[in-house]
């Protein structure tokens, strides 16, 4: 590399010599250029005295140039601040220059893969979310704060349970069976979505969403679904600063659409359908319980306290924070408590050698409410079934109990059941990243980084013997799991410039990862005392299992080359080769690469007259590949496993056929982007993309004869396309000393289409999902019978058959593709921020459109007789009752089926955050609301489900928070 630089430098010097200015008052200047950081000589510094007169510094940082008196010498080098010195007739003859490292302001820095770049110099598609979008959000994790912030990033919560993470998708779903989540990188280390709540949002400095191949390809086989890069805070002040942040809040259900019968309606319904025999309605009518209010807490408390210390000097940089977060769930039996400690430290040992460590410790107490399944005892589900004249409380406010007969309903009181069957988890988490960085010569950086990610999770459930249904015999279960992930990376980065126009940056790297997990669970029964309901007091063990040890390893080599010319033309090339233990020996390695180009139109000479108008004008193009390896660890191997026991002896049998030819899933992405800035006030980003997934990793159904009894086998089959457009607008409409006003808007449209399945198959119905995979159709499209209404003459339900003719028979063969998918093609957000002196007001909305879900709750609530002994929707009072009635609910006894009647528009617009704040001299006081308003046609408790079927879901919470 040095020889290459020397040759270029010599050629530059030779050409420059021919154009060196000559005059009677010429001054010869020479000297050495060094770095302020380490005192080392700088190679390749451009020393310019005007057009055609310039030299480059040598390997020792030396330069010599002859210039006319009165000339301004300009010293410039990539990564350093430019320096200018005026040369007079009196000299100086010897001019040694020290260049200061160019420091990026936080707002001008863009975090990319394995580095940081200045805003406006990146060819790839990268969206940045800064800390001010996260720091005051009253959530245990950062994921909720991203909703509606980035075009092309869909964030949906599958549950409102406090410890749960959201589901994120970047530019559409790219695979049918393998993983669809982005790769999450925190301080250079990959984490899983389950660890979101281990990161205090206030510890985050910035997040970058990498969307195209140019920005993600260097992550190779893990980046097909995009990458989210998270950087935690560092000390940036010269002297130590101490800060405190506290929040107190209250939560309630955010949407809560509830149409189940009250007592008067229930009594009317029972009389109409013949369930009134033996009922004392005079007595029952005195009780009217809204089970939504009985089960869900409208005053669930939240509190958060954080203290941090940060500072920096020439040699030391540190950030230390400690936090406590406690949130009660709005559903009973759910809560989240976290203790966190972060320590980020960097130390410059010598001028050339630096070390650092980023460590995060975390302890959590978690209670999770059962959801997603229909039972008569778990409160979220049971609330829909309980009759309104069954009171879960006694007159004194205590729980009505099956033990003393105060519970008058059928079965068990769900709230009492929960109190007698607690389930708790504890999680211990440690993530530590250490690095050594060496700069043997100027502009050359060698870095080695190692990380250890360890978690230990325990679960403990009890069922007390004093609870009457247990008949005096308790039970207890404990589970334990351990996971550790070791990662190491080594990189070499060299950057230099030739003259003042050509800038180069080269990166070479190697990474390795090893992952291991193991665990067990055991259940014991026979305890006779509530206080002793534990495994050690069981009289017998009734269930046990040892989770099979799971291991995974990965090895990678990668590189990136960047070039820019005169701040006008930028080019990037990246390449990565990955080897994974998840694939067979025939296809263990995969190679991925990408190119990117960016044209900075504003810096063209012919655009000089437009610069007052165009603060930014850039055109970018990228194309390349990335991969997906998100499948179980051993699918390429034929496996045997336990099949239970026979006469007290254990037994094993083949459980998986294996596939040694299993290989990587590939995604080829092409991206075209236009970035415009107008009057330094309005910024517009417009992007088009096309992503094609091939060799999809799918669990392929096998015929019995071909599979030797195995039903499925993983294979590389099928293809899928995602095409879309994104728009992001940020406008600083007013920027005055005492008043400012900002508007932001983003929207993304993604069209998904399956282009190939497996073995010539063009369609395949997915069991228990009401969806079907069909070539030419989008993933997630519903496959249902079409409900046609009710025959007003006799009250029969009507459907359309496959040919569009009316029928009163519900037949599976009449299902059709509906043209409606669970995956929303449209998503986005918009917001505004106003400031008057020290008072500020901000609002942020998020939305998705053309998204559909099956409302499974209605299958039970509107059963029309199938589940009539339990509470039903008040809509059943509007069912068909006599000839001539026009309604969409059939006569009693015509049961509800899974048809298009249950398919609902789950599009929504949500006021995600509203904040009013006042900045005092040394602190900031604010009040804010989360999920304050929801606009939707969906009839369930919440439209934000992350599944194609909505069933007994834990709804999102509305929060009011006071913060300091």
Predicted regions mapped to residue ranges:
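Extended, hydrophobic alpha-helical segments in both membrane/secreted and soluble proteins
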Residues: 204, 341-343, 448, 488, ...
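Glycine-rich, aromatic-lined ligand/substrate-binding cores of catalytic
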Residues: 822-854
